[in-house]
Each structure stands twice: as C-alpha cells, then as structure tokens.
From Swiss-Prot:
<comment type="function">
    <text>eIF-2 functions in the early steps of protein synthesis by forming a ternary complex with GTP and initiator tRNA.</text>
</comment>
<keyword id="KW-0547">Nucleotide-binding</keyword>
<dbReference type="InterPro" id="IPR009001">
    <property type="entry name" value="Transl_elong_EF1A/Init_IF2_C"/>
</dbReference>
<feature type="binding site">
    <location>
        <position position="23"/>
    </location>
    <ligand>
        <name>Mg(2+) 1</name>
    </ligand>
</feature>
<keyword id="KW-0342">GTP-binding</keyword>
<keyword id="KW-0460">Magnesium</keyword>
<comment type="similarity">
    <text>Belongs to the TRAFAC class translation factor GTPase superfamily. Classic translation factor GTPase family. EIF2G subfamily.</text>
</comment>
<dbReference type="GO" id="GO:0001731">
    <property type="term" value="P:formation of translation preinitiation complex"/>
</dbReference>
<keyword id="KW-0648">Protein biosynthesis</keyword>
<feature type="region of interest" description="G5">
    <location>
        <begin position="182"/>
        <end position="184"/>
    </location>
</feature>
<dbReference type="GO" id="GO:0005525">
    <property type="term" value="F:GTP binding"/>
</dbReference>
<dbReference type="Pfam" id="PF09173">
    <property type="entry name" value="eIF2_C"/>
</dbReference>
<feature type="binding site">
    <location>
        <begin position="182"/>
        <end position="184"/>
    </location>
    <ligand>
        <name>GTP</name>
    </ligand>
</feature>
<dbReference type="GO" id="GO:0000049">
    <property type="term" value="F:tRNA binding"/>
</dbReference>
<feature type="binding site">
    <location>
        <position position="46"/>
    </location>
    <ligand>
        <name>Mg(2+) 1</name>
    </ligand>
</feature>
<keyword id="KW-0396">Initiation factor</keyword>
<dbReference type="InterPro" id="IPR044128">
    <property type="entry name" value="eIF2g_GTP-bd"/>
</dbReference>
Length: 414
C-alpha cells in the first residue's frame, strides 16, 4: 500500500481504572508495550503517558467483523491484508495520583477506549473519573472495552455488562458499543478494531493552515558519554493538530522557558528548527496533521530532557496563541466529586485557594485572585499558551490528592 497511509492519522486514548488492562490492550493492537520507564516496569503500572502506533488492516476474503486484524497476512486464508489506516494510541495512567498526566494526554485524543475490567464491580473510582474527564474535555467518540472476560464466567460477564450500561447511562458514553475482550489472550481484537473503525473517525483537519503542535513529551536521546560533535538536538513528542511540518521549518515554542535578567524572571519563547521527523515508527520528510509525531530539533538537549518541554505549544514564529500568566475563566463545577465513595458535594471556588489546571497538554497550578458566581481569575505559577475559549480541566486539593471538580473556559487576561 502507499506510504502515505502508514502515517498515523488519528489519536485514540486508552483510559480507565488502574490495572484494568489498558496497556495490555495496546500491546494486543500494536505489538508494543507502552510502559518503558524503569519505575513502570518495576511497579507494573503506567506512570507517564505511553504511546504506540498500530496499522489497522482487513482481509479481503473474510466477512466483517472477522476481517479486521493487525496482521500483515490473514491466518485463515494466507492472503495479504489491506491497510485501512494507521492510528496512534495514547495510553493514560489509571492510578488516582496521576490524574494530571491523564488529563494532559486527553488533550491529544480524537476518541477514546474506556477499558473496564469484567472481574471488578462497576464503576471503579478512576473509571468514573476518567469518563468525566472525557466529557469535560469534549471527547464524544468512545468505545468501551469490557476486558478480562476470560477471568469470569458467562453470568458474571453478563452482570458486569449490565453494570457498565447502568453506569454510562446519561453520560457522553451512553451510546458507546461495549466490546467483550481478553487483551491478554488476544480474544475479540477484531471486534475492537471494528468498533474503532465505526465509532472513531479520522477528523477533518486543515493541512494548509499554519502548523500547530501540542507537545506532551520531550527527550534527550543522546547516550551518556557522547562526544560533543556527535550530539543530537532535543526531541519533542506530541501531536500536529493543523498544518504540515517539514525538515528545515522554523518553530517557536510557547510559553518557552524562564530566564532571569536584572534580578527579574520572565518567560520567553524559544525558537528552533526542525531537523528530523518521525511518524508511525519511521523517519519521514514531512508530517501531516493527526497521529503522534516525534520532532528532532536544534534545541540544546538539556532543555528537552525529562519531559521539560511537555505542555509547550509549537508553530511558526508569530502564529501561536497568546501566553497567559493570569486569566479569567467561566467555571462549570460538577455536582459532586467523581471517583469518591461518598460522592462529596463540591463547594464553590474561593479567593486564595490553589487549583491545578490542565490547558491542552499543559498542567499548571494557579492561585485564585478573585472568585464570583460562575467565574474566577487565577494567577499561574507557570504560564500557558492557549487561545481564548480553550477548555480547562479544574482540579482542587482534597485530602492528599488533586480531584477533578469542573471545567473552565478561558475568557481573557488580567
């Protein structure tokens, strides 16, 4: 098939409670483990956002939905399969302490698979919290994977299915298909692919627009001990939501980095050039919008190591949205805390309280400088780059962790 079909064209999130099998399902669909961080391997949970690309295929000799596969050759007919499309999976951590990471990943998602373990009551805390996050951020294209059906009998699976249906009633996932699957045994993977093809279409994007890249990760790919002359520039990982990128293009990153001058500190944009591009696991000369992308730059790798540039927005100089050190937002609070056993009521936001805010892929802490009915003003510890009208996930400190309490809409600056 033509190479252009192999570049990922849509981002699909895997969300849900910890240990319900999100990462295992990504492996069944892509052949890749997204848990590569040493602490993740040791603890058996996702800590950072994980990424993997998968080329979805169909056998021309099989009927639907059995025709769908990720194999290049149909095991039943021994015929070459045809490429449908390549997708990028964003594997979000399900642990309650990593909600900010999940929210930053949700900004990249065009659709999502809500993974629900068939061997536990529904909903588990982060099942509920992640579904609410999808609703807040505006992700409507959802598939529900009822995973681990190999661990329960038919009656238990049926009861779990009914619990899922009752749980999603009245939510953004009310009409989402529920697909029984065993990611570990790779059972019903064809049904999952069929649901992805039906429910999560590739969005219409504008390749003629200015490039706009949301950064979710950044890396120093140089090995320790590399000679100065052999050092490569820092790498940014994220999603191109508009426009096209080519090697040699100039990029501006906002909010940039903090610099100190004359005893004062301020945030200044960073400019660089595109040295290399990687999409779908391959080096490419140009990248179209959609899917996940690695951008090799001319930046000093010390600026990009350890996800230091996660949350940045990149595009041609002068084309980016404003950078905000404070802003006003309209606020829509949830009625109760999701994921809490007691369903605690949510109090109004008050002046002086700290909030954790996720805007795009950026997460920052803001101090409320003014609070009124349905709106508030916040001063940010770390500025963000975002257009007016951007959606903001609002988290409040409750006990020992940040809890999702509502959604904001950015209106204007101080």
């Amino acid at each position: 098939m033509a190479d252009e079909h192999r570049q990922p064209e849509v981002n699909i999130g895997l969300v849900g409670h910890v240990d319900h099998g999100k990462t295992t399902l990504v492996r069944a669909l892509s052949g890749e483990w997204t848990d590569q961080h040493s602490e993740e391997m040791k603890r058996g949970i996702s800590i950072r956002l994980g990424y993997a690309d998968a080329t979805l295929r169909r056998c021309p000799d099989c009927d639907e939905p059995e025709c769908y596969t990720v194999a290049e050759t149909c095991p039943e007919h021994d015929t070459a399969t045809e490429i449908e499309r390549t997708v990028s999976f964003v594997d979000a951590p399900g642990h309650e302490t990593l909600m900010a990471t999940m929210l930053s990943g949700a900004a990249l998602m065009d659709g999502a698979v809500l993974v629900v373990g068939a061997n536990e009551p529904v909903p588990q805390p982060q099942t509920e919290e992640h579904l609410m996050a999808l609703d807040i951020i505006g992700i409507e294209n959802i598939v529900i994977a009822q995973n681990k059906v190999d661990l329960v009998d038919a009656e238990e699976a049926r009861q779990n299915y009914e619990e899922i249906q009752a749980f999603v009633e009245g939510t953004v996932a009310e009409d989402a298909p529920v697909v029984p699957v065993s990611a570990e045994q790779e059972i019903n993977v064809d049904l999952v692919i069929d649901a992805l093809q039906t429910e999560i279409a590739t969005p219409d994007r504008d390749p003629s627009a200015d490039p706009l890249l949301y950064a979710a990760r950044s890396f120093d790919i140089n090995r320790p001990g590399t000679e100065w002359g052999g050092l490569l520039g820092g790498v940014i990982g994220g999603s191109l939501v508009d426009g096209e990128l080519e090697a040699g293009d100039e990029l501006e990153l906002r909010p940039g980095r903090e610099v100190e001058e004359g005893g004062k500190t301020e945030w200044r944009p960073v400019t660089t050039d595109v040295r290399s591009l990687q999409a779908g696991g391959e080096d490419v000369d140009s990248a179209s919008p959609g899917g996940l992308l690695g951008v090799g730059t001319g930046l000093d790798p010390s600026l990009t190591k350890g996800d230091a540039l996660a949350g940045q927005v990149a595009g041609p100089p002068g084309s980016l949205p404003p950078t905000w050190e404070s802003f006003e937002m309209d606020v829509d609070l949830l009625e109760r805390l999701v994921g809490a056993a007691d369903g605690e009521q949510i109090d109004d936001i008050s002046t002086g309280e700290p909030l954790m805010l996720t805007v795009g892929t950026a997460t920052t802490v803001g101090s409320v400088t003014s609070a009124r009915d349905g709106e508030c003003e916040v001063a940010l510890k770390r500025p963000v780059c975002a257009p007016a009208g951007a959606k903001i996930a609002i988290n409040r400190r409750v006990g020992a962790r940040w809890r999702l309490i509502g959604v904001g809409t950015l209106t204007e600056s101080e």
